[in-house]
Amino acid sequence: MTRKIIAVIPASGVGSRMQAGLPKQYLKLQNKTILEHTLEIFLAHPDIEKIVVAVAETDPFYPQVALLDSPKIQIVFGGETRAHSVFNALQVIEDDSWVLVHDAARPCLKRSDLDKLLQSDAKHGAILATPAIDTMKRADGDKIMHTEDRSTLWHALTPQFFPTHLLKQALISAFEKNLTVTDEASAMEFSGYQPRLIAGRSDNLKITRPEDLALAEFYLTQNTEK
């Protein structure tokens, strides 16, 4: 059965750790904003019917992004957290669809990783992730408590891919219980689901700090595959 697939891009964050004068999704790499690089990945994919972008209601920058005028893109206003922004986006998406949630500040996603995720047959959804390679320490303040077994640890990436109606229900349940939702998979986990891990590429980085910009620009320069 063919699935109806909608992408959601939460883009209402302020990116305070970037120490920049504007939200990080509007910083430029190769003469395009980070948001434009991200949107182009999904606009180019034939299986994605629509993209819903959640922006801050007071955001003065998004009207200047010409790509947001695409007929495939719908703008909604975000909420107080990333999870609330995603939930607001889900309100304009049909329950019988599947939703693909991706960070606005991950412009280096490869088409091959996106295809691999979309081909997953996990009925409760799946996420891109990378196995932990570094030694992982459990801390108490700035002191090491012990070393974690990294063999079962993964770094969660995006996109994250779920049946829309299940993700809506999971977010509502998490909000009602005042749980901290750091990504969509965590909301699904709180509701008892076990989304599948799909091994992705480590160059699908999230631009968070100033030093990430040069690395992202390098990856984009090398990335001839969308």
Curated annotation (Swiss-Prot):
Pathway: Isoprenoid biosynthesis; isopentenyl diphosphate biosynthesis via DXP pathway; isopentenyl diphosphate from 1-deoxy-D-xylulose 5-phosphate: step 2/6. The record marks R150, K206 as: Positions MEP for the nucleophilic attack. PROSITE patterns: ISPD (PS01295). InterPro entries: IspD, IspD/TarI, IspD/TarI_cytidylyltransf_bact, ISPD_synthase_CS, Nucleotide-diphossugar_trans. GO terms for molecular function: 2-C-methyl-D-erythritol 4-phosphate cytidylyltransferase activity. Keywords: Isoprene biosynthesis, Nucleotidyltransferase, Transferase. The record marks R17, K24 as: Transition state stabilizer. Coiled coil: none annotated. It is an enzyme of class 2 (transferase). CDD domains: CDP-ME_synthetase (cd02516). GO terms for biological process: isopentenyl diphosphate biosynthetic process, methylerythritol 4-phosphate pathway. It catalyses: 2-C-methyl-D-erythritol 4-phosphate + CTP + H(+) = 4-CDP-2-C-methyl-D-erythritol + diphosphate. Gene3D superfamilies: Spore Coat Polysaccharide Biosynthesis Protein SpsA, Chain A. Its EC number is 2.7.7.60. Pfam families: IspD. Catalyzes the formation of 4-diphosphocytidyl-2-C-methyl-D-erythritol from CTP and 2-C-methyl-D-erythritol 4-phosphate (MEP). Belongs to the IspD/TarI cytidylyltransferase family. IspD subfamily. This is 2-C-methyl-D-erythritol 4-phosphate cytidylyltransferase. It comes from Actinobacillus pleuropneumoniae serotype 7 (strain AP76). The lineage of its organism: Bacteria, Pseudomonadati, Pseudomonadota, Gammaproteobacteria, Pasteurellales.
